[in-house]
Amino acid sequence: MSRKSVVQRNLKRVAISAALSEKRKALVAIIKDESLSMSERFAAQLKLSKMPRDSSYIRIRNRCLITGRPRGYYRKFKMSRIVLRQLGSIGQIPGLTKSSW
């Protein structure tokens, strides 16, 4: 199990990123728009750099919902490979069957 503080920090990043994603996308669009003047683009770059670091989606780490494990994460199930195998073997995940051929 991951430390609770690490999991909570990641959840905080998810919330901040969701709240500021539209503003961040708008600023990036202004920065990449070459039809605007250099001063406008530079002002947008300064605003973007003043935004919180945690508002960037790059800083979010996919973690298992049950254990908080950051590695071996399956996006479809939102859990780690270990928990997926445990719950799948006892039939707790609908539609998941053990493969045999």
UniProtKB/Swiss-Prot annotation:
GO terms for cellular component: cytoplasm; small ribosomal subunit. One of its GO terms (biological process) is translation. GO terms for molecular function: rRNA binding; structural constituent of ribosome. It comes from Anaplasma phagocytophilum (strain HZ). Keywords: Ribonucleoprotein, Ribosomal protein, RNA-binding, rRNA-binding. The keyword Transferase does not apply. NCBIfam families: PRK08881.1 (NF006477). Binds 16S rRNA, required for the assembly of 30S particles and may also be responsible for determining the conformation of the 16S rRNA at the A site. Pfam families: Ribosomal_S14 (PF00253). This is Small ribosomal subunit protein uS14. InterPro entries: Ribosomal_uS14, Ribosomal_uS14_bac/plastid, Ribosomal_uS14_CS. Part of the 30S ribosomal subunit. Contacts proteins S3 and S10. It comes from the Bacteria. The keyword rRNA-binding applies. Belongs to the universal ribosomal protein uS14 family.
